[in-house]
From Swiss-Prot:
Induction (free text): Induced by heat-stress.
Tissue occurrence: In the embryo comma stage, expression is strongly detected in cells of the head region and less so in other areas. In early larvae, expressed in postembryonic germ cells derived from Z2 and Z3 cells and the head region, in both hermaphrodites and males. Under heat stress conditions, larval expression is not only detected in germ cells, but also all over the body. In adult hermaphrodites, expression is localized uniquely in the germ cells.
Domain notes: The TPR repeat-binding motif mediates interaction with TPR repeat-containing proteins.
Molecular function via GO: ATP binding; ATP hydrolysis activity; ATP-dependent protein folding chaperone; identical protein binding; nuclear glucocorticoid receptor binding; protein phosphatase 5 binding; protein phosphatase activator activity; unfolded protein binding
Motif (TPR repeat-binding): 698-702
Principal place of residence: cytoplasm
Compositionally skewed regions (Basic and acidic residues) per UniProt: 224-235, 686-702
Protein known as: Heat shock protein 90
GO cellular component annotations of the record: cytoplasm; cytosol; HSP90-CDC37 chaperone complex; membrane raft; perinuclear region of cytoplasm; plasma membrane; protein folding chaperone complex; protein serine/threonine phosphatase complex
Keywords: ATP-binding, Cell cycle, Chaperone, Cytoplasm, Nucleotide-binding, Stress response
Similarity-based family: Belongs to the heat shock protein 90 family.
Compartment annotation: Cytoplasm, Perinuclear region
UniProt binding sites for ATP: N39, D81, K100, F126, R371
Amino acid sequence: MSENAETFAFQAEIAQLMSLIINTFYSNKEIYLRELISNASDALDKIRYQALTEPSELDTGKELFIKITPNKEEKTLTIMDTGIGMTKADLVNNLGTIAKSGTKAFMEALQAGADISMIGQFGVGFYSAFLVADKVVVTSKNNDDDSYQWESSAGGSFVVRPFNDPEVTRGTKIVMHIKEDQIDFLEERKIKEIVKKHSQFIGYPIKLVVEKEREKEVEDEEAVEAKDEEKKEGEVENVADDADKKKTKKIKEKYFEDEELNKTKPIWTRNPDDISNEEYAEFYKSLSNDWEDHLAVKHFSVEGQLEFRALLFVPQRAPFDLFENKKSKNSIKLYVRRVFIMENCEELMPEYLNFIKGVVDSEDLPLNISREMLQQSKILKVIRKNLVKKCMELIDEVAEDKDNFKKFYEQFGKNLKLGIHEDSTNRKKLSDFLRYSTSAGDEPTSLKEYVSRMKENQTQIYYITGESKDVVAASAFVERVKSRGFEVLYMCDPIDEYCVQQLKEYDGKKLVSVTKEGLELPETEEEKKKFEEDKVAYENLCKVIKDILEKKVEKVGVSNRLVSSPCCIVTSEYGWSANMERIMKAQALRDSSTMGYMAAKKHLEINPDHAIMKTLRDRVEVDKNDKTVKDLVVLLFETALLASGFSLEEPQSHASRIYRMIKLGLDIGDDEIEDSAVPSSCTAEAKIEGAEEDASRMEEVD
C-alpha cells in the first residue's frame, strides 16, 4: 500500500502552530486528552444526527462510544470513536492544508501569554496531541469513502495512504506515539483523573481498556505426580472417598477489560439541589472548551403545556470572536429527549445573548427536526421566550454582586447595549443593567442611581457621546450643564450611539443629548429674560455669520449651554451627533446617500457672554463688510467644528489660516517670507484680506 501514499506540506500557519506546541514548555499538557475526546464527541453527534433521518448510516456500527487504549510496551495511546469518520479529503484539509480562522488568532494569543488550554476555543484542538506525542497516526473511515490513514511526526509534512483497519468500520482511531518524558500519560490512574476532570459529562460512553488480574484454578501438576507415586507403592485407594478428584492450584492471570469512565447521567436532568458548584464548573468546561470556571449559572425546568430543561452559563470573559458574524457560535446545544440534535441552535437565543453557553433539552420537539423546521417551530419560539426571560434573571443575579457585575459588564456590556437596540420587549429590563461614567464621579452609575440623584427642578437625563471619557469631560457642551449642578452621563462606546437611538427615556425621564439642538435647562425668570435680550442683541451678528458660512450651517443662534467657549456646533435633534458622524465615516460599507442627509444639519451656537463674540459683534456693528470678519468667522467655525468633535473637510486651508494668525501675532509681514516657502495653493485660498492694515485690530480680538 505504501506506493499509494501521498505526502502533503502543512499550511504555513499550522506548521508554525505545531512548532510552537512542540518546542515550548507547557505545564498543563493533559488538555490534549480533553481536546481529542471533545472532537470524538462532535463526530459521534454528527453520525447520530445523520442517523435520525437515515438510519442505515448506523449499519456500519450501531454502538456509539469512545475508547481509550494505553499500551505501555509500545508506548502508544489510542483514542478511537465510532463517529462519522473522515474522508480522504477531510483528512487532508482538516488535518493540515487548510488553516482554521482561529489558527493565527490562537498563536497570537499564545505569544501574548495565553494559556495553551484555550486551544479548543480556536478550533485547532487536534494539534494538542503533539504536546505529548512525537508521532501521530490517524486512521479514519467515513461511510462515503474508503478507509485512509494520516501520519505525521510534525516535521512540516504529513502522509495520507489507503489503509484498512478491521477495528475501524466507521469512525476515527488516533494512535499517539508518546514522548519518552510523557509516558506517565499511559498510566491508568492518570487517564482516569484527566477524564474525570475534563470530560466526565461527555454524552457518550468513554471506555478505558484496563489491565486486570484474576485468580484462575489450574491443575496442580506436582500434586498429580505425587499421587501417581503413591499408586505405584500399592496402597489401596478409596474410590468413593475422593472420586478421582483432581488436585488444583490458584494462579494470577492478566486480562483486559473495558471500563466506562463517565457513567454520570446528564447533569441537566438531575435535581439542581443535588449538584455541587464543582460539578457545574466541570460540565461548563466540557461544554464550552473554556479553561476558566463560569461566572454564573441558571439551572431550571419548565413544565405544563410545554416541557423542557435548560442549563445556562455566563462565562468569565468574552471570546476573541464574539461579534464575528461569519463564524457560527458554539453557544446553545439542543437536545430532544436526551438525544443530541445540534451544536449551535441560533434560533434559541437572540444575537445579543450569544455569549450565553448551555444546553436545552426539549420533550416536545420531534427528533428529526431540521434547521428549516426550527425556524417555523412555534414550540421553539416559546422556548426562546422563556430562555431570554431566564437570562434576564441570571444577569439580575450577577448584578447583585458589585464586583462580579463589574467583571461581567466589562466583557459583555456591548451585548446589553446591542439588546437595547434590537429587543424592544426587554428594553426596559436591559436598561437597568447599563452603567456609565458621569460628571459626578469616577464610579460607573446605573440609570436608576442617576434618576435618584436628579435635582428637584430637573426633568431630563443629560448625556454626551464621544470618543473617550477625557474628551467628553472637557467638551464645551457640558460646561453650562455642569456649572448648574446637573449630572451628565458620559457615553464613550461607539455602540452607545445606536443604543440611545432606541432608549428614548428611562423611568419617564427623557434622555437628552447635550450636543443636540433644543437643550432645555431649568431657568429662572431672570435667566429667561436675559436669554431673550441676548437673542435680540446678537441677531445682526448671527445673520452676518450665516451669510458668510452659507450652506455650511443650517442655522446660527445664541447658545444657553456655553460658559468658557466662544461657540460650538450642535446638530438637529434627529440628526447624527458628531460622534455618530465619526463612527459612520469609519464604516467601510457606509451608504453615502445616508451620510448626505443625516450628517448635513449643523447649527452654530454662539456664546453671548464671551469677549470674542462681543468684540466681533462690535466690529460688525461698525462695518459688516469688515475685511477681517469673514476670515475670523470661518476660523471660528472650523475651530468650533474640531472642538465639537467633527472633522474638517479641508484641513489644509484651516492650517493655513492658523499659520496666518501666527504670522500676525509675531508681526511677520509677507515680504519677510520667501515665496518658495509657501505653496501657491495655500496662499491663494487662505490669505486673509487686509491682513497688514488689520494686524493691530486682531490684537483687540485676543
